[in-house]
């Protein structure tokens, strides 16, 4: 057991449920507490208790979170939504909150990943492969068709393809703070990459070629990480990375190009854990000053599939 009582936020979501299952299976904690903005979810089947919290942008969020920590004797917090991570970052609580550690990557990695324009600028400044990216209200797209996406928040939300100058003009009026981004092709060359750098400076990675279903990775196959290794090492260096992030890219005719960095655990975290890339457990161990052991990358071409599950609560 690494911790006694763990609080995982966003417990209605797929990532939090995956982390809860990993923690249970590994015997990493004695008790699991979850919290979310509503109670209509499967969390009670996986957590010992589920609490309600206001949305992260509401003024009472941190106060409510503190009450939960104290009431349940929580000794580690794992924030799962980017909105919550952003609030903890802004309040100076990335290292710890209410006297207990917060499990997260380093500050620079989080600041960069939360802002997709900052992601573009930092990686481009380090000579790493990125699609051209512009702020909608400041400059027109370099070419059409292109992607229109949020600057902050989940990249898949409100993402759309823009084909015409008429659509460009509408976006300039309605979404001036969002981003134009190069359309990366081919579509079937999309990869999600787990990237972990230990406190001792060891970099570990796993690359999965994925197929999306409903915005999530529905199926994936392990790819040889060798062609992506220089890029991923470069990202870890550019972010002075400590901890775990998720890198999303497409392999184009001009090489791999990164279109997003998620500064949190990935929705494929349980896929990866089963393949030996145990970034969640490594993060817990290192937060306690414990050794993480060796990592052996899985063989290419291993396939994995996300399956529906039935949960009864009552």
Describe the residue ranges of each PLM region:
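Active-site flanking residues adjacent to catalytic metal/cofactor-binding acidic residues
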Residues: 35, 148, 181, 247, ...
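Short, glycine/acidic-enriched loop or turn micro-motifs at the edges of active sites
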Residues: 39, 152, 263
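Short, charged, surface-exposed secondary-structure boundary motifs
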Residues: 43-45, 61-63, 110-117, 158-159, ...
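ATP-dependent carboxylate activation and anion-phosphoryl transfer catalytic cores
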Residues: 72, 226-314
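Phosphate-binding site of ATP-dependent enzymes
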Residues: 160-240, 250-251, 255-257
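Active-site nucleotide/adenylate-binding loops and adjacent lid/helix of ATP-dependent enzymes
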Residues: 107-187, 197-202, 226
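ATP-binding N-terminal substructure of ATP-dependent carboxylate-amine bond-forming enzymes
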Residues: 1-103
């Amino acid at each position: 057991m690494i911790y006694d009582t763990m609080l995982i936020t966003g417990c209605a979501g797929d990532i939090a449920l995956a982390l809860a299952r990993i923690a249970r299976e590994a015997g990493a904690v004695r008790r699991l507490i979850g919290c979310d903005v509503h109670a209509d979810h499967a969390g009670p089947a996986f957590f010992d208790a589920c609490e309600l919290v206001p949305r992260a942008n509401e003024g009472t969020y941190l106060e409510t979170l503190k009450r939960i920590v104290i009431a349940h004797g929580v000794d580690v917090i794992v924030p799962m939504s980017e909105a919550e991570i952003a609030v903890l970052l802004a309040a100076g609580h990335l290292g710890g909150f209410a006297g207990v550690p917060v499990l997260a990557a380093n500050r620079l990695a989080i600041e960069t990943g939360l802002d997709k324009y900052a992601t573009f600028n930092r990686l481009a400044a380090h000579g790493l492969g990125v699609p051209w990216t512009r702020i909608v209200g400041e400059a027109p797209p370099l070419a059409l068709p292109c992607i229109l996406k949020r600057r902050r928040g989940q990249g898949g939300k409100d993402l759309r393809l823009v084909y015409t100058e008429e659509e460009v003009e509408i976006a300039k009026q309605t979404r001036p703070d969002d981003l134009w981004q190069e359309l990366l092709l081919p579509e079937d060359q999309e990869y999600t990459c787990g990237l972990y750098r230990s406190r001792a400076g060891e970099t570990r990675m796993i690359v999965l070629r994925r197929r999306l279903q409903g915005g999530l990775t529905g199926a994936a196959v392990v790819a040889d990480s060798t062609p992506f290794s220089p890029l991923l090492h470069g990202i870890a260096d550019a972010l002075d990375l400590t901890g775990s992030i998720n890198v999303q890219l497409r392999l184009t005719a001009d090489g791999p190009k990164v279109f997003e960095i998620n500064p949190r655990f990935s929705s494929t975290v349980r896929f990866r854990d089963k393949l030996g890339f145990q970034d969640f457990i490594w993060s817990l161990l290192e937060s306690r000053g414990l050794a993480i052991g060796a990592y052996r990358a899985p063989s290419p071409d291993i396939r994995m599939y996300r399956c529906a599950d039935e949960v009864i609560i009552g």
